[in-house]
Amino acid sequence: MEGFMAKKIGRREFVKKSAKIGITAVLGTGVVSQIIEGSVRVFEGEHIDIGVVTGSDYYSSTIKAVDLIGGIKRFVPKDSRVAILPNVQRWHPGTYTKPEIVRSVINMCKKAGAKEINCLSWLDRKNWEATGLAAVIKEEGANLKLVEREETFFKPVKIPKGKALKEAWIMKEFFNNDVFINMPVTKDHAGNKFTGTMKNLMGLNFSTSNRSFHKKDWQTDKNAIEHLDQCIADLNTVIKPALCVVDATEFIITNGPMGPGEILKPQKVVVGVDRVAVDSYCKTLWGIKDEEIFMIKFGYEHGLGEMDLNKVKIKEKKI
């Protein structure tokens, strides 16, 4: 595996890479989901949709949660390049993915035989350093790839099923990977009241495009909130994570997504493939009702997953 890299992917690096491997390879081909489609292997054991482990040892909880749904080798083939997307929007307690959860996923990927592990972001280095995530990534020999917030480094992707969002701008660096692991922290949001697996994919989309999700009065107007949630659901139709690992150990339930805010501590790590089901489960941790989160309903309507937890097999464990 390559050594640690924590630098901006800038214009010079992009031009150099384009000349070296060809612009088509950098841009990728087809819909984004085709890159990681089929990366989930058939699991012959008991079928579990969502694995949940409760405990204060977040590193071990993450491993055990993934084991509940078939183990990391079900999702990460040998010699694959793995893209990881933690939430590092801020550094206040309960607003970012815990370093030990990210460390655990990196180590599982290494044991599965991944040849390259890349943590992707267009957020500033300060966020990664202040949360302790940069140090963990360096210690574990993974790569931190920070992409400049310039249109040059993002690829336009049409959204055929989009109702509100017709085109996304996905970071080109993402296309150099074989497997995508989505690693949000579940928490409050000022507009739609919930951040989880589906909303975390905005971390791959160009910030200017993300701003179009937010209409005037997006924090208070029902129509504007529905527009935000529809854009998020639309974005999810062209990006399909192989695995979602959610930090629900502690998270803010007020003043999200940046914080600081009131913190709830369920001490849970939640994993699964079905984003809609995982988000449906996570919102129950602080009593949010189905009808209050349009994004989950819209994701279900897009056929992205199951929102009725009575139809989902959940296995929980305490350590």
Residue ranges and their predicted role:
Residues 2-319:
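N-terminal and secondary-structure boundary signal
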